[in-house]
Amino acid sequence: MDKYALLQRAKLHLDFIHANSTTHSFLFGALAELLDNARDAGAVRLDVFSVDNETLQGGFMLCFLDDGCGMSPDEASDVIYFGTSKKRLSTLKFIGQYGNGLKSGSMRIGKDCILFTKKEETMTCLFFSQTFCEKEGLTEVVVPIPSWLTRTRESITDDPQKFFTELSIIFKYSPFKTEAELMQQFDMIYGRCGTLLIIYNLKLLLSGEPELDVTTDKEDILMAEAPEEIPERRSFRAYTAVLYFEPRMKIFIQAKRVQTKHLCYSLYKPRKYQYTTSSFKGKFKTEVQKAEEAVKRAELLFKEVQAKVNQPDRIALSSTQDALQKALQDVDTKHKSLRQKQRALRKARTLSLFFGVNTEDQHQAGMFIYSNNRLIKMYEKVGPQLKMKSLLGAGIIGIVNIPLETMEPSHNKQEFLNVQEYNHLLKVMGQYLIQYCKDIGISNRNLTLFWDEFKYQHSKDTDSSLESLQWRRRQAMGIPFILQCDLCLKWRVLPSSSNYQEKGLPDLWICASNPNNLENSCNQIERLPSIPLGTVNRRPPSKDERERQLQESVQRYQDKLVEAQPQKSQLIVTSKIPEFKSSCLSSALKEKSKLGRIQPSGADLTQGSPSSVKLSFMQRSQKRSTEDTHSDVEFICMTKIPKKSVKKTVKYLQPGHAPALLENLKLEDTAQVSSREIKKQQSESLVQAGKASTDVASSRDPTVTMVWDQSSTKVSLKQEEEEEVPLIKPDKQELCDDTPVVKGNSSALHWKSLPGVQMEDLSPRSGHKINSVSGDCQLPASPMPSQSMSVEETARKLLSNLREILLYFVPEFQLSSEFECTSVEELITNPELERCPENINEKLKTCFNQIQNIYMAQYEKRLKRKMQSIVYEANRRGLLNQVFLGQCELKRKRTEEKLSDLRAKLALLLQKLQLGGPAGDPQQIDAYLEDLLKEDRLPTALHEKSPESA
C-alpha cells in the first residue's frame, strides 16, 4: 500500500454526525437501535430511564443500562469507526450489521453521549460529544476513551498525559465533574459486565420542548406532539412490546416491566400460511456477484504465478511451486463457494405469513414486517385495507419475519433496500389477507355482526363490572394468555382459570407461579399454542371475470381476423337482397362441400307468409372417422326484427334435394387449399347463404345483418357461444335465430342457441309440420353447456399439474431462457397461460421437452445416487447392528456367569446359616429364597447366629 501513500484520503467531517442521524425519520426507530445493541450483546435485562438535570438542554438525561457482555478497551475503540462491524462476519444472527446504530441513534436523540462499559477486569469510558468539538473549533470528530482496572480502579495507559487530557475533556463537557462521579456510573452496572449509555443535551422541537415527553406519564416515554390513533407511534412502552418477533429480553421503562407481546399468539383466530417463492434474490445476487469477482481475481493471480513458474530462464524453486499450489487451491475454493452461492440463488424459500384479528380496536390493522426478528414496518395497509370505504380487512393484523439473507433492511432499519421486492411482498400479503377473510368466515356481509360482538372494547364508560366480562369473552374467543418467565425467558401458557387479569400482571413472574403443573418449572420445554394452517384454494372465476375473459378472447380473435383480412365483416341490408336462382345456390353448396363445411342453402329457405320463417337444417353422413370430428362453427349474428311479424317453424330438407346434397357431401373434404382462398370462399358462400336465409315481408325498414366468419382453430368458439347465450334476455328483445352450421357427426343443433324458438313450437302438438329425415340424417341430442365447463375444468387441472411439476423441478434446476421469465413464479402466475394458451403452445412444448429430457434425467441421476447412499447406509447399519449384537451376546453370557456364581455363593451361605441347602437348579434356588423370606426365618436365624459367633 506504500504506492498510495501520497494520494488524498477521505476524512469524516463533524457535520456528518448530524447528517447521519437524520436518517431516522421515526424517533422511536433511533431508540430501537440502542435496544438492538443490548440484544446483540446477549443482555437479559435492559433498563431505559430518565434522570432529571435542569442544567442540561431538555431538562433530563436518557439512560440505557443492560447486563450484556460489555466491551473491552479495544472493542470500545472500534465503536468510533463508521460502517465497520464484526457482527457481519459472525455466524450468529445479530440484528446490527452496519456498525452505525450507536452513532446515528444516540445523535438523533441528543447532541452528546457518554458510554460506560465493563468487561472482564477492565472498565472503559467513551465520550462522544458534538458540543465539545464545536466549542473547541474542531472539524473532525475527537473521541476520548479512558480505561481503568476493575479491582484497583487504576488507569490503563502508556501515556499519562493522554489519560489526563481525556479526563479533563470529560470533566468539562459532561455532567460528571470528578473521577469519583465517573466511578459511580460504573457501579450502576450491577454485574461483572454490562453497558450504561447516557444521552444528554436532548434535541428540542420548535416550541422549545424536548421531543421525548417523560412528564405526562411517569411510567412511560412518549413522543411529543404525536397522533394518538396508534399507540405504538406515541408510546415507547407500546412500541417496545412489539419490537421483536420473538421477545427474549426483559425491558424496563422507568423502572416498570414492559409486557412484551408474542404478537402471533395475541390475535383472535390466527392462521399461518406458507408462501414459497424464489423472487427475493436481492442479497443472493450480490453474493453471487462478489463470488464471481473473487473467482476472477483468484484465476488472475493463478495465471500470474503460473507465468512466473513457466519462465524458461527461471529455476523452479520449491517456494514458487508452493505458491502455485496455493493459488490453485484458492481457485478451487473460490469456485466451490461460487457454486454454493449459485445454488442458494436458485433455491426457493418459504416465508411464514401469520394473520389474526385485533379485537381491541378494528382501526388498528395492517401488516407487521419483521427482518431478522426486528420490527421494520408496522400497520402497512395491503389489499382491501388500501380502499378508503372498504371494511374488509378491518382489524386484521398480518405478521411476517423475513430472514436477513432474503430481504435486506436499510441502515436505519425502517425501510428495505429493494423497494420492488418489498412492494411485491405487500401485494402477496394482500392476496393472502383476502384468503384469510374467507377462511375465518369474514365477508362484507357479516362484518357488522362480527364487530358488534366487540363493541365493549370501544366503550369509554366501561365500569369495573365489565372488566371480568371482557376477560371471559377474551378467553371464550380462544386467545391464549401467555407470560414470559423472568428467569428462563420462556413463554408459558396460563390456563383460563387463572385470575391474573383481574389482579393485574406482576412485575416479576416465574415458571413456578404457573398453575399448570406441566409447565411450572424452568427446566421444562417451551410449549406455545399451535397456529392452524390456512387453506389456499384456487378460487373459481366470478361471473364478471368470466365475462371479461370472454370479451378479451373475442377481442383477440377479432384482432387476428383484422390482421389476416381487413375486409372480414360485411353489412347486408336484407330489404335489398335479391332472390337467387337455384343454380347459384347449388354452386354455393358445391363450393362449401369442397371445403368440408355445410351451410343452409337458399333453396331450402323458402318464403312463407309474413308471420313465418322456414328454417332448414342439414347434417353430414356418419362416414367420417372420429379423428376428423373437429367442428368449425359459422354463424350469422342475430338480427333485430319486430315481434309482430316474426313466427318460426322448422322444416327439414325435401326429398328431392337430399340425393343431390348427399352426392355433394361425398366429395373429398381434405383438399389442400391456401388459407386465404379458404377464408375468401367461406366469406362469399356465407354471405350468399345469409342473403337467402332471411325474408321478412311485413318489415318496411331495412334490417342490417352482420356476418362473421369464425374459422380459426385456435379459439374454441363453441365455448364462447355457450357462455354468451345466457346473457341474452328473450323477454326484452326478439332476436332471429343463430344458425350454426356444423360439420361432423359429433355435433348437433344447439337448441339453447335459438332463444327466439320456444320448445313447444317444435312439438307436433303445436300444429307445425315436421318431416322425417331420410337416410342416415338424424337429429342427435343437444349437447349441454356442461361440456364447455368440463373443458375449462380439464384445462385448469392441466395448468395446475404443470405448476406442480415446475415448482418441483425448477428450484433445483435452471429455467430455460426460452420462457422469457426470470423465475418460475412469473411463468406459473402469468395470466396469459389461462386466458390465451394458444399463444404459448411453443413455450409449453419446450417446457415439457425440457422436463422430459433434462429435468427427468437429472432427477433420475439424483434419485439413483440417493438410493445408492440409502443402500450403503443400510448395509453399514446392518454391520454395526451385527457387531452390537455380538457385544450384547457377550455381555449376556458374562452376566449369566456372574449370576451363577452368585447363586452358588448364596447356597453356601445358607448352608452355613443352617437354613438348608437348595438344589443346584437356578429356578429352585430362587423359589427356595422366596419361601425363606416369606416365612421370616432368615432374620431369626441371623439373630441366633450372632450370639453364637460372639
UniProtKB/Swiss-Prot annotation:
A zinc finger (CW-type) spans 465-530. GO terms for biological process: behavioral fear response; cell differentiation; epigenetic programing of male pronucleus; epigenetic regulation of gene expression; negative regulation of DNA-templated transcription initiation; negative regulation of gene expression; regulatory ncRNA-mediated gene silencing; retrotransposition. The keyword Metal-binding applies. It is found in: Nucleus. Residues 532-551, 679-700 are annotated as: Disordered. Keywords: Coiled coil, Developmental protein, Differentiation, Metal-binding, Nucleus, RNA-mediated gene silencing, Spermatogenesis, Zinc, Zinc-finger. Expressed at very low level in male germ cells. One of its GO terms (molecular function) is zinc ion binding. Residues 281-342, 885-916 form a coiled coil. Residues 541-550 have a biased composition (Basic and acidic residues). The keyword Cell membrane does not apply. It comes from the Eukaryota. Zn(2+) binds at C485, C488, C511, C522. GO terms for cellular component: male germ cell nucleus; nucleus. PANTHER family: MORC FAMILY CW-TYPE ZINC FINGER PROTEIN 1, ZINC FINGER CW-TYPE COILED-COIL DOMAIN PROTEIN 1. Required for spermatogenesis. Essential for de novo DNA methylation and silencing of transposable elements in the male embryonic germ cells. Not required for piRNA biosynthesis. This is MORC family CW-type zinc finger protein 1.
